[in-house]
Amino acid sequence: MKTTFRLMGIADVITLINGLLGVAALMFIILAVEELQNPYFADGVKTNYIWGAMTCILLSVIGDIIDGPIARRYSKRKLLGGTLDVMSDCVSFCVAPALLMFVMFGRWGEAAPIWSISLGIAACWVIVTGMLRLARFQYEEASDKVYFHGLASPANAMVLITAAALIWLQPSSGFGPDVS
């Protein structure tokens, strides 16, 4: 009987690292809001956690780009790699970016409850649609189609964190490190 680790190829290891980068992004996000009433410190410590989460998501996108060609060339077990890839993508490109947006723009203790509720619904929408997209891609991968519909989950994550970073860097936006 073979162990799971013996079934893994190099692409599976890269996929696991991508998933761990998604978990690291979630940990950075949790650290960024350790104190929900005052998430921005003057010395930028909490802001550095936000940038750390964004960096982990970006590195996961890069890993996801390279694990596909490696898997197609050197794959030992296609089923194991495909399942790992979907789980890793869900954490790194659905949950982490949605939670990051919720934390960055939640305005804890300042905003009206309707803002937080709307932002929470938007974050849940990103997660659910991302999961459905990944499930659909996994299902359609078994057929002979050579294309897919919609926005790929890594591209969705990049759109979200790019928009968030651009808003975050604008001092007049009321968000980000220069909030007084």
Named regions from a protein language model:
Residues 92, 130, 139, 163-168:
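Non-catalytic alpha-helical coupling and interface elements of nucleotide-dependent molecular machines
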Residues 23-26, 59, 63, 68, ...:
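Alpha-helical transmembrane segments of polytopic integral membrane proteins
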Residues 12-13, 44, 51, 55, ...:
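Multi-pass membrane catalytic core of lipid/isoprenoid biosynthesis enzymes
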Residues 1-2, 145-180:
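C-terminal membrane-associated helical module and adjoining short loops/tails
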Residues 24, 70-73, 91, 95, ...:
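Generic hydrophobic alpha-helical membrane-span motif
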Residues 26-54, 98-121, 163-180:
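Helix-coil boundary and interhelical linker segments in multi-pass alpha-helical membrane proteins
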Residues 1-65:
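Topogenic membrane-insertion module of multi-pass membrane proteins
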Residues 1-19, 70-90, 132-155:
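Interhelical loop and helix-boundary elements at the membrane-water interface
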